[in-house]
Amino acid sequence: MMDARCIVNAGEFQKALEKVLKVAPKKCSIPALMEVLVRFDGDACTLTCTDLELWCQASIPAEGGSCAFVLAGSRRLLTACKFLPGELEFSYRKGQPPEHAPTKTDLDGDLWISCGGKEICQRVTAAEEFPELPDVEAEHTYTVQTASLRKRFERIKYALSDDSIRPCNQCVKFFDNRIGAVDGHRLAMNRDEALCVDAPFHIPPGAMRLLPVFEGADCQLLVGKRRAAFDSGDIRIITKLPEGESLDFDAAIPRHYPEGYTVNISDFVGNLQYLEKFISNPSREPIRFNGGVLLLHTKSGDYRSRLDMEDAPRQEIGFRASYMLDGLQQFQAKKLDTVSMQMNTPVSPIILTDQVDTALVLPFYLNRAA
């Protein structure tokens, strides 16, 4: 029999366990994917989870020997960790492979976890049952301020597509100093000179949603042909990259706007939220914007609300209330008071911008509205 004894700080282990479990599926036909791979290697303990598309790995200091196993009941252990202060001691005994070809059961082992007067003893799965961590052959490497990138993603994620036929549109596009999202009805993007990429690529939203695990620390973004990784040394997120092309953002945004106005964001949002209460069929009941007045016609009645604007549009344009609200809230998240609204014709996209963030909302064709 092979034995190993390892020690970690209980609080650090709980924190790392909570981070990596964000990736593990709660239900899966492959049992190992619902659990955490734990690997001790002398002075480090590394925890890994995956759903085969996305990987999350966290390392913490450790003492002791070397061993690896797949936990049983990882989420229950996470809950139990709050009752285990101080040091956690892991004692692992792996089954000795027989002379004949070993079976899965032969390679499984026994694990004891002790802390003070508390002890857990359970059968655990052999590390060989867990998928191997993929390599990221980086062609480009960038330094990322995760706190800033997280905020930028939160502002634009509303425009991500759910169309699986176009996987790139389900992802965040990184191009020059910008990131963007588009779903066919809306477009959202923002820029930051601190992160400028050499060639466009697309990061799935699952990886972007994991940025909080870095707790604001800077990391390296490694981009290859098939995979990308956010890596701070202690935390690593690996994701597959989608194949195909996405929208050319610059080609989609009109360059000439004969009409431009400054709108008060909270005033516009409040008036839209008021009118939205009377909408029963969003796909057939647009907001009409004419002369600074928001108009809504429904089967139950007509409703209007006037915006606080010094200069009002000279042409009528229609839009879906929820789409415009999403665009305005992109700027509201930055705690801005006003934003520039730019329009071309009643059938051209409506642009909201502060020169750093941009939101595009497609118009509603009013000749079909009634």
Q: Where on the chain are the PLM-derived regions?
A:
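Structural preference for solvent-exposed beta-strand-turn elements
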Residues: M1-A370
